[in-house]
Amino acid sequence: MNTLVIVLIAAVVLVCAYAFYGRWLAKTWGIDPNAKTPAVKFNDGKDYVPTNGWTVFSHQFSSIAGAGPVTGAIQAAAFGWLPVLLWVLIGGVFFGAVTDFGALYASVKNDGKSMGMLIEKYIGKLGRRLFLIFEWLFCCIVIAAFADMVAGTFNAYTVTDGVAALSDAATTNGAAGMVSIMFMVFAVVFGLIQKKFNFSGWKEAVLGIVFIVLSFVIGMNFPLVFNKATWSYITFVYIFFAAVLPMWLLKQPRDYMTTFMFIGMIAGAVVGLLVAHPTMNLPVFTGFNNASLGTMFPILFVTVACGAVSGFHSLVSSGTSSKTVENEKDMLKVGYGAMVLESMLAVLALCVAGAAASADGTPAAGTPFQIFSRGVAGFFEMFGVPVYVATVFMTMCVSALALTSLDAVARIGRMAFQELFSVDDMEHAEGWRKVLCNTYFSTIVTLAFGFLLTQIGYANIWPLFGSANQLLSALVLVTLCVFLKVTGRNNKMLFPPLIIMLCVTFTALVQRLIAMVKAIQAAASTTIPAGETTWGAVFIANGLQLIIAILLIVLGLTIVVNTFKSYVNSEKNSEKASA
């Protein structure tokens, strides 16, 4: 099938979903353009900052459009491109966008409270504590993984037999690294200029584009050739500042500039597919069971993840975006709009991978990021863009997909740690509680734990990320159901995605648990040849996953049970009130 047809179908579906279903949700739940948003009521110049709608949209989109939509869609294509396409469209429209919009809406209507605080208000304190612990650990794991990914992207060296040498991509990677650093520098300049002159519309856009061009010109002419360890240190220093500095000074302007770059990447992919209209070479459907991934249910849903629905998105919606929305009318494009655009990115990644596959359906060699990067860079080259420029641009885009999520999750992790130990009257808090809730202390603890995971092997627990992410989305849907019910709003549209996500999550966790038990049993009953592995290594890799899988199941069930009780109580209270 022609990839152009797939892109056009997806575009029509997603645009119609935003125009009709998204607006129906906004009308059903109730949007008040005259209401004071938390950003206006609690403007503190740091976390609560009134910001125009398109800037908040750029923050939301660049923060949620991480590695997931590209890697997930391409990896899940092992089941065939049609199941992936269907789930991205159905999941994006009725699951992901609804969850993101709902989380943003609930937070804005509750003074910018994060999801953990909403759980306390509508479900109970136990649910809040459990959720915040889960959220913080989740953020630390993402910090470790994405920081390692960013450092690896900029790394200019390869190590062979213990000897480091410059890689073939040293100049390209170094240039992308320098571009990224200039993005950070110009973001601060952008923020200061915006603070003084309050540019908007075309003036703001021109300023952002000028800084983007300058960043690439400087970066491509003065590449920074560092090893992975050095880039890792630089990355953690950056996300420390991104987590503690006021939103307007670094995070928002950098996200705004990055969104323009992402739009350029998406436009390049779309125009390339329009002009070349290559054939989708990946198979339509390969079966309900894949030898390497497992059964299509629930693995397809867990693997596609961010391209259709992601719990992490809700943390961004309720953690940062809700505190910067200037007017409630902007919530639709920020919450629902950013998600459907990410679903479009997942479709484009699928089509690029399909075009790169061989005629017999064999996937292209390399990681999903490499396949996508090479494919889009090839489209740019087709239009006369020099190979070096196209490669640096796509390397920067790939790193930015991870980096913009990384700085967001660092800030969210810091806030989760603070909320875990906070009380209502924090102004009079003293002693250990005041220290633990300090912005700088909580940031250092969060990043230190994330850095520790990069050193001791986060990969041992990373396979559970997909299930944990989907569990997060299920818990958010559970909370939104109670919120809408208690506040007298229609919540029926959440029941189908909630039930399906609970089934997906717990099935995936149970499958993982069984697989880990079998792996440990096999290792215990087998004599492992010397030099291959050890019992300790097997237990660390599988035993740790087993423990975490059990904890996730217990956590999920505990919150679901408490939510059910709260929901039943709200039903009884409403019946008494109407009697």
List each model region and its residues:
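Extracellular/periplasmic helix-exit of transmembrane alpha-helices
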Residues: 101, 273-287, 340-375
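Membrane-interface loop-to-helix entry segments
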Residues: 16-30, 134, 174-218, 228-275, ...
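Membrane-interface "cap" regions at the ends of multi-pass membrane proteins
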Residues: 16-70, 259, 295, 299
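Extracellular loop-to-transmembrane helix junctions
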Residues: 2-19, 76-107, 116, 175-187, ...
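Transmembrane helix-loop junctions in multi-pass membrane proteins
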Residues: 2, 69-70, 82, 141-166, ...
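Loop-to-transmembrane helix boundary motifs in multi-pass membrane proteins
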Residues: 125-140, 337-344, 390, 419-455
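Flexible loop linkers connecting adjacent transmembrane helices
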Residues: 23-49, 72-75, 85, 89, ...
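Hydrophobic, membrane-embedded alpha-helices of multi-pass small-molecule transporters
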Residues: 52-68, 228-245, 257-259, 268-278, ...
